[in-house]
């Protein structure tokens, strides 16, 4: 049993059926995986999301495979998930200057169609081995028709679940998107 950091009382663990979290540019709803530790003495809750890095990797791939045009906050999310500076990201995306990445992230200039597809491919390729629960097929992006949406459009949260993964590398749990996990 865990002890409360405030009052040292015992904390009771439960699993939250749904938990919505902003990962810094992309919002996800985590299903049946978030652990909540509740202290009945001081009424404090502590929330724990397992494998946050894996959740971020799988979320980035899921967003890259969604045909809705990328916004600046999502490009920034990709870069942060890849743990890159703007200069490193520009180099990885084969861009001439880091200023281009800055313009994309600040929505000063949108990502052009060809650059957007290349960015999506690169993000998926760089993360696919780390997000074993979220498969990536390059043909999906190659055939993708990008969808324009209104500037004030707020996308629904991506629904993410823990999935059991068995492969040559290792067995274990990983993150997958709800729609992809059901398929």
Where are these regions (language model features)?
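N-terminal flexible/basic segments that precede or flank functional cores
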Residues: 1-68, 128, 133-148, 160-164
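DNA major-groove recognition helix of helix-turn-helix
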Residues: 93, 104-108, 115, 123
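Short alpha-helical DNA-recognition segment
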Residues: 85-102
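Charged, low-complexity regulatory segments of eukaryotic nuclear chromatin/transcription proteins
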Residues: 140-183
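Short basic helix-loop element that most often maps to the first helix and adjoining turn
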Residues: 75-88
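DNA major-groove recognition helix of helix-turn-helix/homeodomain DNA-binding modules
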Residues: 113-132
